[in-house]
Amino acid sequence: MEVGIDIVSLERIEVLYSRYGVRFLEKILLPEEVALCLQKPQIVASVAGRFAAKEAIVKALGSGFAQGVHWKSFAILNDAAGRPYVKVIDDECLPPSSVVKLSISHDRHSAVAVAIIE
């Protein structure tokens, strides 16, 4: 079992989103994720949560964004109950038998995510 955690400032994401708009989202998120974020009333918090989740996952992997792992290797989506889950796009970044558990939270200032890979 491996664990990763990340925290990101909502202000940091707000600055990037204000400066680059949807181009910023498209750089770090897959189209399905972008669509989900743009539907949320708090777009920046939704983007920040996914950003933190992806960072937490690569920390749990131990590779960071290297060795073929990149922002779009996996998507952070939500099930019918709103719980986050990982949709693996690039099978080489995670072994097929891996189970990834995620927890994402945010307040007015930051978003945090914890990833557990079993």
Swiss-Prot record:
Name the catalysed reactions.
Answer: apo-[ACP] + CoA = holo-[ACP] + adenosine 3',5'-bisphosphate + H(+)
Q: GO: which molecular function terms?
A: holo-[acyl-carrier-protein] synthase activity; magnesium ion binding
Query: Which residues of the sequence carry a binding annotation for Mg(2+)?
Result: D6, E55
Q: Where in the cell is it found?
A: Cytoplasm
Report which superkingdom the organism of origin falls in.
Bacteria
**EC number(s) from the headed UniProt entry:** 2.7.8.7
Ordered alphabetically, the record's keywords are:
Cytoplasm, Fatty acid biosynthesis, Fatty acid metabolism, Lipid biosynthesis, Lipid metabolism, Magnesium, Metal-binding, Transferase
Q: Which residues form a coiled coil?
A: none
Q: In Gene Ontology terms, what is a biological process of this protein?
A: fatty acid biosynthetic process
One Pfam entry for this protein is ACPS
Cofactor dependence is on: Mg(2+)
Gene3D superfamilies given in the database record: 4'-phosphopantetheinyl transferase domain
A GO CC term attached to the entry: cytoplasm
Record's family?
Belongs to the P-Pant transferase superfamily. AcpS family.
| Protein task | Transfers the 4'-phosphopantetheine moiety from coenzyme A to a Ser of acyl-carrier-protein.
Q: What is this protein called?
A: Holo-[acyl-carrier-protein] synthase
Species of origin reads Chlorobium chlorochromatii (strain CaD3)
